[in-house]
Amino acid sequence: MDFALRQITERIRTATAEHTPLRLRGGGSKDFYGESLQGELLDLTPLNGITSYEPSELVVTARAGTPLAELEATLAEQGQCLAFEPPHFAPGATVGGMVAAGLSGPSRASVGGVRDFVLGVKLINGRGELLTFGGQVMKNVAGYDVSRLMVGALGTLGVLTEISLKVLPVAPAEATLVFEIDQARALAQLHRWGGQPLPLNASCWVCDDTAPGRPELLFVRLRGAMAAVDSACCKMTQVLPGTRMDNAVAGPDWLAFRDLHLPFFTQPQTPDNALCLWRLSVPQTAPVLDLPYAQLIEWHGGQRWLWAPPSAQTLLRQTAEQVGGFATLFIAAYAGTTGATARFTPLKPPLDRIHQRLKAEFDPAGIFNRARLSPSF
C-alpha cells in the first residue's frame, strides 16, 4: 500500500471511530450535482495515475484521482476513447468523479452509459477495508455486480481508489447532419431511423433562440465506417432535406454540448434569476411533453433538458412519471443551495429499503458524503 492510499485509509478509520462525516472530492467539477456537501474534505487527487493500459485488450485501469483529460489524451494516442463521452464540466474532472456521478454524454443512447464500461473497481469501505470487485476482462457476472453499483452512487458507499474500464477504437468516420423540423416530427423521425441499420451516434433537437426566426433544429451525429456514414447521409437527406456540417464546426459544438456549455445551458435572465436546470429522463418513445418550458432533447428522445423554477417540481415529476421516466433538478438556481426541492426523485419504499441496507453494509457509520443522494442517506 503506497503512502497516499495508506493516509486515506487511516483517515477513514479515524473518521469512522469518531463518527466524523467526510466529503469525498476529486477535482470538484461536479460539486453542484446532488443534495448537500457535508463533512470534512477528503481530497482524493493524490490517488492518480494510469496503472495499466493494454490497447490490444481494449482495457485501461486508472486510479480515481487521475484527471479525466489525461486519461482521454492517453487513449487518443492509441486511437481509442471512452465511447460514452463522460462530461467534464470543468478542467479538474477525475476518473473517480466520472464513475461516482455516473453521467454520460451525447452518445449515451447509442453506445451505453458509464456502468456499461466499468469492468472492476477497488474501493475503501466505511470500515477502512480495501476491497476489490470485478476485474480487467469482460465476462458474464454471476451474482451482484458490485463494480457497477458504484456508478452514480456519488461516493456514498465507499472511496473509489482504482477503476478498470473498457475502451473502444475511435470511429474512422463521423458526420453531423442538421435538419429544420419541429419537435413532434423530429421525435417521430428519430424513432424511424432508430429502426434502420444506420450508424446513429447522437442527436440533439433544440429551438435556436439566437437565430432569426427561431428555427427548430435537429442535429444527428453519425459514426462508423466511412462507407456506412456516407451512405447514411445520402439516405437520411433523401427522406428529410438537411445539410451536412463541417466536422471542424460540429466537433467543438458536440464537445460544448457534452459539457453543457451551449447557449441553451446558460441560465435565462428573470427578475429573480430563480430558474433551475432540470433533466427529464424518459423512454425514447415518449411523446412531446405538455410542459410550458422550452426544451433541448437528446439521446434520440430519452433525455430532455429545460429551465424551470423549483416550484415546478410536482408538474415535472408527474409528467415524467406518466411516461415512465423521472425528473432531476440538475443545477440549482443559486450555486451552493439546495432548498426544499429534492434534487432526485424520491425512491419508492421498497427500493429505498434496498438502498439503506446497502449503505449500512458498505458504510455502517454513515460517514461518506452524507445526504448527497438524499437527506436520509
Regions found by a protein language model. Name each.
Residues 26, 220, 306:
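Residue-level signal for inorganic ion chemistry
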Residues 69-71, 184-189, 227-234, 285-292, ...:
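Short, conserved charged micro-motifs
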Residues 27-32, 37, 47-49, 67-68:
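Short active-site-proximal "capping" loops at secondary-structure junctions
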Residues 37, 55-56, 125-127, 208-209, ...:
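Short acidic-glycine loop/turn motifs at beta-strand connectors
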Residues 16, 76, 194, 320-321:
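Anion (oxyanion) recognition and catalysis
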Residues 3, 35-37, 243-377:
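Conserved glycine-rich FAD pyrophosphate-binding loop
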Residues 1-22, 44-91, 99, 103-136, ...:
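N-terminal glycine-rich flavin-associated loop
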Residues 100, 119-269:
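C-terminal substrate-binding/cap subdomain adjacent to the FAD-binding core in PCMH-type
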